[in-house]
């Protein structure tokens, strides 16, 4: 039990009989047996408590890993949703860009077909086209030199 051989146990029993006497020896043996039983129960209880704590620590580690996995999965789903939203926005912007480019192409076609027709149809240009150019003023001052119209 404790690494003792048979001769050592006999020596301890003889010493116990000498010190305790035959009257008290049975009571002492019962008390020693109860002590070892209690000691064994305490050791087993401590062992089971330690094992439970180790299991709890392992469960905590597992829970932490699962939490990290769930967090990573949630962030990847958020990124995926964000990328999907960006793709949707990109397609909307490209559609708008295409419609603007088509409008620009139509305007360019109209301009290149007959620019004079567009100028004649423009109400702002109608006033300027119908007006006669004004005569230049007789006195022009160019680079501090006076040019006077000679009559």
From Swiss-Prot:
Pfam family, one: TatA_B_E
Spans through the membrane: 1-21
Entry membrane topology: Single-pass membrane protein
Cellular compartments per GO CC: TAT protein transport complex
Biased composition (Polar residues): 132-142
Spans annotated as Disordered: 120-151
Top-level taxon of the source organism: Bacteria
InterPro entries per record: TatA/B/E, TatB
Chain intervals with Low complexity compositional bias: 120-131
Principal location: membrane
GO molecular function annotation: protein transmembrane transporter activity
Keywords assigned: Cell inner membrane, Cell membrane, Membrane, Protein transport, Translocation, Transmembrane, Transmembrane helix, Transport
GO term, biological process aspect, one: protein transport by the Tat complex
Cell compartments where the protein resides: Cell inner membrane
Protein family: Belongs to the TatB family.
Oligomeric and partner information: The Tat system comprises two distinct complexes: a TatABC complex, containing multiple copies of TatA, TatB and TatC subunits, and a separate TatA complex, containing only TatA subunits. Substrates initially bind to the TatABC complex, which probably triggers association of the separate TatA complex to form the active translocon.
Function: Part of the twin-arginine translocation (Tat) system that transports large folded proteins containing a characteristic twin-arginine motif in their signal peptide across membranes. Together with TatC, TatB is part of a receptor directly interacting with Tat signal peptides. TatB may form an oligomeric binding site that transiently accommodates folded Tat precursor proteins before their translocation.
Name the record gives this protein: Sec-independent protein translocase protein TatB
Species assigned in the record: Campylobacter fetus subsp. fetus (strain 82-40)
